[in-house]
């Protein structure tokens, strides 16, 4: 079992450069080890990022003002770890897993060197043992369960225990705090272990026990353009790059509200503090459409905003994914929303510059692509020993400067994700929300989704490809019309253009502030998409471009009204009949 050394190494500061300190020490220090720097009776948390002989470079997670040459540094003997156990949900952490609500009680402003336990030690949890004396277990096996909200939170053999252990004692059912010993065990060498409800794990190491399996279940998010044009599977990875003001954060908030997953980890890494405040104000009052419970019951927030130290941005990303992996091991489906990975990459660039490493493109470190790949590879679906499956879906927002998708962070991300939802400034300016551009977005999961839906909807994949064809052709025809006008193109092209505009306006665009249209269930999407496919296949008889435009504008209005009606209500059914009758008045034949 991995344990913390009882002896601590000490050293002293010999050079300070911003939040990077050079420290000389006597003893043994590991890469990634946590250190504490003494400043005016406060101890500032830091991480070892480079070891050279008897000197190390450490990045401090707080303001290093007043740090002087000779300041005492103590090395803790353990890596930067996450504390995992009951009580993570409904909490708001910073990048070092301090509970911000507890810190707020002590002072209006965050004090330097003040840290609190990640899990409340006073809360009592109803514990039900599952293991019995004599059971032979390995890491990740269940010792018992507690009820956390409406989830069965599995208390597992710690992942730091790499040996088979035999249970020698189990606590009886009852209410206990997280630091209560709930089981004891012994390994083959006779070493004794005591297990509590809490375990710790280094955040930069993958937290997984079981077999990775191919993703095979659709993640319904209630956004038509995502579910249809750019689908994602549970356990998949996707990114949402876009310029300032394109709607990245609003889209991520929508995903956190309506995605068909069990747990949502919202990692606000370097974004504006106002957006985090909006989440904290809204979520407790919003209802999860899948369970009817408060959204906060399934949400954990790590809000390392741009006003916090740059060094903590990196730790917040890794903390978020470690918590997500922990819940995946319980057989739950988890969605991690990282907003934004560009701020994390900028933190890497800053630290790399202070380490005087050879820079890569745009001064980002040469290892940027491998760091981003390692982050996204921690996602995926996992089958546990008991046959249950859990998944971790990762969505990373990318904020390229000026909306330039050719910059290094976006390109490194595109090479490893399974779907790309590119947000367009032009669509946002035209108020075509969500502003995901279907012309540049893609998904590697489209064929798999078609196979999954084959029993329910025959030819789904081909129908989506046909819709993409109309979008591409309509876009090209629209560009020609800007030059030669409507009179300069044949009626067949005019028809294709109007069909593509109808599909964009009535299907791809969605009103996030409408109580009905904000979330479109998959069954409703299938019915609406079938209507769109029928319109694509239809042939119409128009004697002039004006008549064609008038007809499609009327059709747009009827379908848009239909989108605001409750699914399968009397108003919805009447609206659908009106649309079908209107189609039949101009339809000549069906291909």
Swiss-Prot record:
It catalyses: ATP + H2O + 4 H(+)(in) = ADP + phosphate + 5 H(+)(out). CDD domains: ATP-synt_F1_V1_A1_AB_FliI_N, ATP-synt_V_A-type_alpha_C, V_A-ATPase_A. One of its GO terms (molecular function) is ATP binding. Keywords: ATP synthesis, ATP-binding, Hydrogen ion transport, Ion transport, Nucleotide-binding, Translocase, Transport. SUPFAM superfamilies: P-loop containing nucleoside triphosphate hydrolases (SSF52540). It is an enzyme of class 7 (translocase). The keyword rRNA processing does not apply. This is V-type ATP synthase alpha chain.
């Amino acid at each position: 079992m991995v344990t913390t050394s009882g002896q601590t190494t000490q050293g002293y500061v010999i050079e300070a450069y911003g939040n990077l300190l050079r420290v000389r020490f006597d003893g043994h220090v590991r890469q990634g080890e946590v250190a504490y720097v003494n400043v005016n009776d406060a101890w500032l948390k830091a991480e070892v990022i480079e070891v050279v002989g008897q000197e190390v470079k450490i990045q401090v997670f707080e303001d290093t003002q007043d740090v002087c040459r000779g300041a005492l540094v103590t090395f803790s003997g353990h890596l930067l770890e996450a504390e995992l156990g009951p009580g993570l949900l409904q909490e708001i952490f910073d990048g070092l897993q301090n509970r911000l609500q507890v810190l707020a009680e002590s002072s209006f402003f965050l004090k330097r060197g003040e840290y609190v336990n990640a899990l409340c030690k006073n809360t009592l949890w109803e514990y039900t043992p599952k293991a019995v004396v004599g059971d032979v277990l390995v890491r990740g096996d269940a010792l018992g369960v507690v009820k956390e909200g409406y989830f069965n939170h599995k208390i597992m053999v710690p992942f730091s225990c790499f040996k088979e252990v035999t249970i020698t004692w189990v606590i009886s059912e009852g209410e206990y705090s997280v630091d209560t010993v709930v089981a004891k065990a012994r390994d083959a060498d006779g070493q004794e272990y005591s297990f509590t409800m809490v375990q710790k794990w280094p955040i930069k190491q993958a937290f997984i026990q079981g077999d990775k399996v191919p993703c095979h279940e659709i993640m319904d998010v209630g956004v038509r353009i995502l579910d249809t044009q750019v689908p994602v599977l549970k356990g998949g990875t996707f990114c949402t790059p876009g310029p300032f003001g394109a709607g990245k954060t609003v889209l991520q908030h929508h995903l956190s509200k309506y995605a068909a997953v069990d747990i949502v980890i919202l990692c606000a890494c370097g974004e504006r503090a106002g957006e985090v405040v909006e989440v904290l104000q809204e979520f407790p009052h919003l209802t999860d459409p899948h369970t009817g419970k408060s959204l906060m019951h399934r949400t954990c927030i790590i809000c390392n905003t741009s006003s916090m130290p740059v060094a903590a941005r990196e730790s917040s990303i890794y903390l978020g994914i470690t918590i997500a992996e922990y819940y995946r091991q319980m057989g739950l489906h988890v969605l991690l929303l990282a907003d934004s990975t560009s701020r994390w990459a900028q933190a890497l660039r800053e630290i790399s510059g202070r380490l005087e490493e050879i820079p890569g493109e745009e001064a980002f470190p040469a290892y940027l692509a491998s760091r981003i790949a390692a982050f996204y590879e921690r996602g995926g679906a996992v089958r546990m020993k008991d046959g249950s499956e859990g998944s971790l879906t990762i969505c990373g927002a990318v904020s390229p400067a000026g909306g330039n998708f050719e910059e290094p962070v976006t390109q490194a991300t595109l090479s490893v994700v399974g779907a790309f939802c590119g947000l367009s400034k032009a669509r946002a300016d035209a108020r075509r929300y969500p502003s995901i551009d279907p012309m540049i977005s893609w998904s590697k999961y489209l064929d798999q989704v078609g196979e999954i839906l084959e029993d329910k909807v025959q030819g789904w994949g081909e129908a989506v490809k046909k819709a993409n064809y109309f979008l591409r052709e309509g876009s090209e025809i629209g560009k020609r019309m800007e030059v030669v006008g409507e009179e300069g193109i044949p009626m067949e092209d005019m028809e294709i253009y109007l069909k593509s505009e109808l599909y964009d306006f009535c299907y791809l665009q969605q009103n996030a502030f409408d109580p009905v249209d904000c979330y479109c269930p998959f069954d409703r999407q299938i019915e609406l998409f079938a209507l769109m496919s029928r319109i694509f296949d239809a042939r119409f008889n128009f004697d002039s471009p004006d008549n064609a435009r008038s007809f499609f504008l009327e059709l747009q209005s009827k379908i848009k009204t239909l989108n605001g009606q409750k699914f399968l209500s009397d108003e919805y059914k009447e609206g659908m009949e009106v649309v079908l009758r209107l189609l039949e008045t101009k339809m000549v034949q069906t291909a």
